[in-house]
């Protein structure tokens, strides 16, 4: 029996789509994340990510902290699915416009360059979500922090979630009860999750606009925040005058602003936390379960590092999009065009790798 080329093509598509549907029905979406996920399919991905960050650090010393913040803000909104990287479309609003991201989230161009380099080495293989997770880990390590293997195997969302971002991202003026509720809402219910992840503010910068109330009119009293060290208050007022440019940047950590270490916690003990939500961990009347952790992390760098890695892995496992869910975006800013074609091929690749 002979078949025409068109018949073969039609048959091939039928098989592909059938396999895809069967896989979707079988739903491997509960696939477990593993550090070895790309060991065969893209063994150089970590080196590519690292090299991209190293190159960027030469001209932008802030980029490590900015990338870590992107990962944090990604994971808190529908899990770590790279939804924060999507631009506006006619179907959804970007998370970049959320209150916690607008005019503050940064690093998107370096993520673009990173993804282009990864695609050249391993086409259609590494998700933007996993790449951002690796980039966050490498940013910490390059700044002097711990090194660890991140669990991988996430896939990318098909949309952004602006309303959820506005609801889920913690604000710099949050009280400790608000912070605890915020973290618990996404499944991070241990005090160590909150205190260790807040330690990401051991490097990076913040804009004056987020601390003006602390400096001049805390809780509409016309007075500064009473938990703010008076000497530090005067330093901050010099950097952020009452009628000054509120976009001016201030170091989160006045001691070692570019180094990932435990000095953030030393600062909190001295009432030198930059934003209210940081100082709340040590100065709030509700801090009975967080003060001991602040003290422990201030006294032991390795204690902090161990807690931070554990909390990062827990955050990275918030409702991950895996298996046949979502897709592997070719450009982190947009959902793949011809998504059905890409998704079917991805499903076949997924089956082949099992």
From Swiss-Prot:
Active site per database record: 73
GO CC terms of this entry: cytosol; extracellular region; plant-type cell wall; plant-type vacuole; secretory vesicle
Residues engaged in binding Ca(2+) 1: 74, 77, 79, 81, 83
Keyword set includes Transferase: no
Cofactor binding description: Binds 1 heme b (iron(II)-protoporphyrin IX) group per subunit. Binds 2 calcium ions per subunit.
Catalytic activity field: 2 a phenolic donor + H2O2 = 2 a phenolic radical donor + 2 H2O
Subcellular localization: Secreted; Vacuole
Entry-linked InterPro entries: Haem_peroxidase, Haem_peroxidase_sf, Peroxidase_pln, Peroxidases_AS, Peroxidases_heam-ligand_BS, Secretory_peroxidase
Tissue specificity note: Expressed in roots.
Positions of heme b binding: 201
Function: Removal of H(2)O(2), oxidation of toxic reductants, biosynthesis and degradation of lignin, suberization, auxin catabolism, response to environmental stresses such as wounding, pathogen attack and oxidative stress. These functions might be dependent on each isozyme/isoform in each plant tissue. May be implicated in the systemic acquired resistance response via the salicylic acid signal transduction pathway.
Descriptive protein name: Peroxidase 33
Native organism taxonomy: Eukaryota, Viridiplantae, Streptophyta, Embryophyta, Tracheophyta
Encoding gene per record: PER33
């Amino acid at each position: 029996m002979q078949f025409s080329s068109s018949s073969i093509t039609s048959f091939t598509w039928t098989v592909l789509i059938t396999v895809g549907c069967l896989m979707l029905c079988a739903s491997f979406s509960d696939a477990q994340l593993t550090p070895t996920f790309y060991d065969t399919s893209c063994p150089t991905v970590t080196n590519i990510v690292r090299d991209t960050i190293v190159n960027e650090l030469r001209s932008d010393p802030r980029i490590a902290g900015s990338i870590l913040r992107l990962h944090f803000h990604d994971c808190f909104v529908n899990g770590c699915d790279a939804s924060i990287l999507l631009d506006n479309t006619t179907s959804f609003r970007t998370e970049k416009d959320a209150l916690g991201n607008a005019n503050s989230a940064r690093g998107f161009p370096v993520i673009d360059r990173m993804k282009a380099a990864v695609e050249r080495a391993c086409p259609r293989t590494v998700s933007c979500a996993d790449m951002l997770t690796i980039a966050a880990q490498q940013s910490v390590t390059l700044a002097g922090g711990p090194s660890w293997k991140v669990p991988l195997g996430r896939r990318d969302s098909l949309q952004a979630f602006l309303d959820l971002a506005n609801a889920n991202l913690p604000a710099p003026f949050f009280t400790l009860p608000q912070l605890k509720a915020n973290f618990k809402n996404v499944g991070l219910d241990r005090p160590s999750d909150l205190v260790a992840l807040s330690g990401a503010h051991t490097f990076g910068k913040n804009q004056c606009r987020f601390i003006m109330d602390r400096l001049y009119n805390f809780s509409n009293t016309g007075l500064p925040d009473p938990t703010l060290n008076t000497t530090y208050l005067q330093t901050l007022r010099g950097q952020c005058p009452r009628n000054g440019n509120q976009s001016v940047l201030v170091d989160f950590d006045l001691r070692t602003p570019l180094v990932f270490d435990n000095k953030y916690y030393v600062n909190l003990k001295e009432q030198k936390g930059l934003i209210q939500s940081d100082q709340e961990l040590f100065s709030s009347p509700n801090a009975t379960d967080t003060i001991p952790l602040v003290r422990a992390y201030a006294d032991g760098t390795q204690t902090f590092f161990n807690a931070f890695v554990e909390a990062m892995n827990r955050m990275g496992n918030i409702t991950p999009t895996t298996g046949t869910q979502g897709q592997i975006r070719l450009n982190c800013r947009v959902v793949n065009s011809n998504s059905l074609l890409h998704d079917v091929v991805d499903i076949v690749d997924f089956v082949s790798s099992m």
